[in-house]
Curated annotation (Swiss-Prot):
Catalytic activity: Endonucleolytic cleavage of RNA, removing extra 3' nucleotides from tRNA precursor, generating 3' termini of tRNAs. A 3'-hydroxy group is left at the tRNA terminus and a 5'-phosphoryl group is left at the trailer molecule
Main location: cytoplasm
Cofactor: Zn(2+)
Entry note: cofactor: Binds 2 Zn(2+) ions.
Binding site for Zn(2+) 1: 62, 64, 182, 253
Family listed: Belongs to the RNase Z family.
Organism lineage string: Eukaryota, Metazoa, Chordata, Craniata, Vertebrata
Protein name: Zinc phosphodiesterase ELAC protein 1
EC numbers: 3.1.26.11
Chain's role: Zinc phosphodiesterase, which displays some tRNA 3'-processing endonuclease activity. Specifically involved in tRNA repair: acts downstream of the ribosome-associated quality control (RQC) pathway by removing a 2',3'-cyclic phosphate from tRNAs following cleavage by ANKZF1. tRNAs are then processed by TRNT1.
GO molecular function terms listed in the Swiss-Prot or TrEMBL record: 3'-tRNA processing endoribonuclease activity; metal ion binding; tRNA-specific ribonuclease activity
Gene field: ELAC1
Compartments in which it is found: Cytoplasm, Cytosol; Nucleus
Length: 363
């Protein structure tokens, strides 16, 4: 099962000609999950190999404009491109409290009626995620009625035992959110692929006298079969070790995690995506504004024993290497060196718009 991440926007604060506002897509077998949706994300999607109509889930890390102002426009474009008869499953949208009302207000004020259903699930933040004066209580707007295509979403509270939020638990994935510290409540997401049955052991099947055909499929799917001689063959008799799932972790803007839940959820991540807005010489400024530097990101990655660190959300002063004029590339390359020095020279990737990173199946 193929899995990859496409970066649509790797810049901080606002979109520019060289770096779009924050957005990336996790793609698995054709299904696309969008993480953040800064202004201009739909245009970036059009320039990529991805199809907006394949998006089934959207995750918003926090409610700063450069991470979600592109959402209403994207939803409208998906609607316009979908035609009048749509029977698709609802698009599931996850984000902090306030996101549901934002979408509702933009749809109401623009007299927009989406042709597809959607559901907004809101994460309730805690007081230790940002400065006290910035934490706002959820305010329910006085709605005359719900948009016709909006389903009833969940209000997701922090699990006090695990210090995380359970967002998705289906046949393939478990997705949990964890708290980050920023100027406003921000979240990170851990996407874990569930273990899959191991491959069939052809030699054992032959030795046990299992004939090729439907019995193979049943055993592969965890169902025992009875042979003509009355012998029962269990899946564990003929299956190799289960294939361990992959783990991708995506952090929103932050100057740190609130507790150790983030470390636990990101432990041994195959891919850890972390912001690095400013270089290490500006660490005090970064922390003041709730952001990270390469050293801070790499320290977290090292604590998690992440297998690969990707830095993103760069200040627009840091041009991509390929697009920087002579001498300008030094700044972005220095960020890479700063992170690698913490990770004992383990290679660190600098995200660029339209970069695609594959996450191979574990052997």
């Amino acid at each position: 099962m193929s899995m990859d991440v496409t970066f649509l926007g790797t810049g901080a604060a606002y979109p520019s000609p060289t770096r779009g506002a924050s957005a990336l897509v996790l793609r698995c077998e054709g299904e696309c999950w969008l993480f953040d949706c800064g202004e201009g994300t739909q245009t970036q999607l059009m320039k990529s190999q991805l199809k907006a109509g394949r998006i089934t889930k959207i995750f918003i890390t926090h409610l700063h404009g450069d991470h979600f102002f592109g959402l209403p426009g994207l939803l409208c474009t998906i609607s316009l491109q979908s035609g009048s008869m749509v029977t698709k499953q609802p698009i599931e949208i996850y984000g902090p409290v306030g996101l549901r009302d934002f979408i509702w207000r933009t749809m109401e004020l623009s007299h927009t009626e989406l042709v597809f259903p959607y559901v907004v699930h809101e994460l309730v933040p805690t007081a230790d995620q940002c400065p006290t004066e910035e934490l706002q209580e959820s305010v329910q707007v006085d709605k005359t009625d719900n948009p016709p295509k909006e389903g009833e979403g969940r209000t997701i509270l922090l699990d006090s035992e695990e210090n995380s939020y359970l967002l998705v638990d289906d046949e393939q994935f478990v997705v949990k959110a964890f708290r980050l510290f920023h100027r406003i409540p921000s979240f990170g997401f851990s996407v874990v692929e569930k273990k899959r049955p191991g491959k069939l052991n052809a030699q054992k099947l032959k030795d046990l006298g299992v004939p090729p055909g439907p019995a193979y499929g049943k055993l592969k799917n965890g169902i025992s079969v009875v042979l003509e001689n009355g012998v029962t063959i269990s899946p564990q008799d003929v299956l190799k070790k289960p294939i361990v799932g992959r783990k991708i972790c995506i952090l929103g803007d932050c100057s740190g995690v609130v507790d150790d839940a983030g470390v636990k959820l990101c432990f041994e991540a195959d891919l850890l995506i972390h912001e690095a807005t400013l270089d290490d010489t500006q660490m005090d400024k970064a922390k003041e504004h709730g952001h990270s530097t390469p050293q801070m990101a790499a320290t977290f990655a090292k604590l998690c024993q992440a297998k690969r660190l990707v830095l993103t959300h760069f200040s627009q002063r840091y041009k991509p290497v390929a697009l920087a004029r002579e001498g300008e590339a030094d700044g972005i390359v220095e960020l890479k060196k700063q992170a690698e020095s913490v990770l004992d020279l383990q290679e660190v990737t600098l995200a660029e718009d339209f970069m695609v990173i594959s996450i191979p199946i574990k052997k």
